[in-house]
Amino acid sequence: MGRKWANIVAKKTAKDGANSKVYAKFGVEIYVAAKKGDPDPETNSALKFVIDRAKQAQVPKHIIDKAIDKAKGNTDETFVEGRYEGFGPNGSMIIVDTLTSNVNRTAANVRSAFGKNGGNMGASGSVSFMFDKKGVVVFAGDDADAIFELLLEADVEVDDVEAEDGTITIYTAPTDLHKAIVALKESGIQEFNVTELEMIPQSEVSLEGDDLATFEKLYDALEDDEDVQKIYTNVDGF
């Protein structure tokens, strides 16, 4: 599973212009977290969590600082979280999380992306019941048993710990993700590849040929929208 997360990160950053879009989306997320609380990450755990994730995505420091400075200013720009669910070809399912200053624009854009790229929008809950929300932590290591014991001693609710190709992948209860990160840092682990709240599919589908091409087109159209923060899917490799 460690390889899976590495492949997903590589795929997301391989597209031309992908980095600038990732930076912009993290800029919005950092601004919102800083605006909701103290703009100091040392006293605002939600902001620190977003900044840590931004650093994992190699977002430059000046982008992070600019978003925090904007939150410190007098701007009253507000952003609203949203979730959309839908279907692609041959049993594929998609959850789209958004963060937007214009809900009507975002809803229209997401609906258009589905409609023009071989997908269908679904009602709220039509897809998400087939996914489980989990905390995911990925870092270099090979002793899954030792990590499992460490987390149990820290009273972390652990769903699974996997070791593959020199990488440890941990799945936790969503409410225990922060606790897991703290326990790992206290044990001396300081570098993380992934620290995310994810929607994990209960089962995956593999697509080939035209179905895969259609799905990639749909996925890219959604990912290219500036208001789309995260996409979850049951398609293997995404």
From Swiss-Prot:
InterPro entries to which the protein is assigned, alphabetical: Integrase-like_N, TACO1_YebC-like_2nd/3rd_dom, TACO1_YebC_N, Transcrip_reg_TACO1-like, Transcrip_reg_TACO1-like_dom3, Transcrip_reg_TACO1_YeeN, YebC-like
Example GO BP: regulation of DNA-templated transcription
Predominant location: cytoplasm
Alphabetical list of Pfam families matching this protein: TACO1_YebC_N (PF20772), Transcrip_reg (PF01709)
Alphabetized GO MF terms: DNA binding
Homology family: Belongs to the TACO1 family. YeeN subfamily.
Record-given protein name: Probable transcriptional regulatory protein SSU05_0402
Species the sequence originates in: Streptococcus suis (strain 05ZYH33)
